[in-house]
A protein has these predicted regions:
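Surface-exposed, charge/polar-rich loops and edge strands
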Residues: 1-337
Length: 337
């Protein structure tokens, strides 16, 4: 099995460039049962009920893209991926990495500069942020939202690339399935007997990275930090159904079931996969040849191809600011055929 097994034709016109003003007005392809029903996310409370646990990833996107100038002239760019030390050291994607020797200092403004450190390969470097005050305050002041490369329209309101329940600024990308939810939708779910729980998985760049190897056995996921609180784990154990909002939530829950409630995970969810926690997935429509589609096949089976065809034919909007799908976990075929 290789990346070509997860290829499909995605027209540019199907890629949503801007978010909807009304978040839950996004369309929802309800494929939990055998019959596909066209709904909106606002219908979600009617599709869940007592005993269900809805789990969200409450990470917040850090405005982590820093545009810098070199003292010798020219420009550079740093995308902060994760903090390493309390002294302002980060792992970052640096461009142009090969032209910046270790020890090079780049200026963001008069107060914030970046010292380029060890080469980690793949364009990644250790960098140290130097400023007179708190580092995160400087990043929020100077940084830009690291939007996916397929979004070419200027985002007028950066908060539209944040979930309404986001907390700690740490991620390089949003857990986009959660962008559709509002407090009103979540309150309606609670009123119907649904328990809402949260976890944190710090989303990295694998969200945007296509699979480039010919064999999935050779694909390696970058590690991401995650933490699943004890209350979330307990709720999932007692749930009638665990409904994960987004692929990052799936990755965190299934990592916790294997490796413990907190840590760094490089779990690559691919067929065949033994899901131990998640029963239903709320997810956006993903890029061709991506690890997220591989996860979707592991979860829902090859049916996703038919569902994507239906969505494209019916004018659904795809990718980060696009519409959503609700799908149940495929059951093992025990027919012996």
């Amino acid at each position: 099995m290789g990346p070509e097994d997860f290829a499909y034709q995605l027209p540019d016109a199907a890629i949503a460039q801007v978010p909807l003003e009304d978040r839950p007005a996004a369309r929802l392809l309800d494929a939990v049962g055998d019959r596909v029903v066209h709904r909106t996310v606002r219908d979600l409370p009617s599709l869940v009920g007592p005993g269900d646990v809805l789990v969200v990833n409450d990470t917040r996107v850090l405005p982590a893209r820093l545009r810098l100038r070199r003292r010798t002239g020219g420009s550079a760019e740093v995308l902060l991926l994760r903090t390493l030390e309390g002294d302002g050291t980060w792992e970052a994607l640096v461009r142009p990495s090969r032209k910046l020797p270790e020890g090079t200092t780049l200026a963001v403004d008069d107060d914030l500069s970046v010292e380029v450190g060890r080469d980690l390969g793949d364009g990644r470097r250790h960098v140290r942020l130097l400023c007179s005050g708190p580092v995160l305050e400087a990043v929020h002041r100077c940084g830009e939202m690291p939007l996916p490369p397929y979004l070419t329209t200027v985002l007028e309101d950066p908060d539209r690339y944040q979930t309404v329940y986001s907390r700690r600024s740490a991620s390089a990308a949003a857990p986009t399935a959660g962008l559709h939810l509002t407090e009103q939708v979540l309150d309606a779910c609670r009123a119907g007997g649904v328990r809402i729980e949260s976890l944190e998985l710090v989303v990295g760049l694998d969200t945007f990275r296509p699979i480039t190897v010919d064999d999935l056995d050779e694909h390696r996921m970058h590690r991401e930090d995650y933490c699943v609180p004890a209350t979330t784990l307990e709720a999932c154990r007692d749930a009638s159904r665990v409904i994960a909002v987004g692929t990052t939530t799936v990755r965190a829950l299934e990592s916790a079931a294997r490796y413990g409630a907190e840590g760094r995970t490089d779990l690559f969810i691919r067929p065949p996969f033994d899901f131990r926690v998640v029963d239903v997935l709320l997810t956006n429509f993903h890029q061709p040849r991506s690890s997220l589609l591989v996860m979707l096949e592991a979860f829902a089976g090859p049916r996703w191809r038919e569902l994507y065809g239906t969505a494209l034919a019916d004018g659904y909007r795809f990718l980060s600011f696009g519409d959503a799908m609700l799908v149940g976990r495929a059951r093992p075929d025990r027919s012996g055929a």
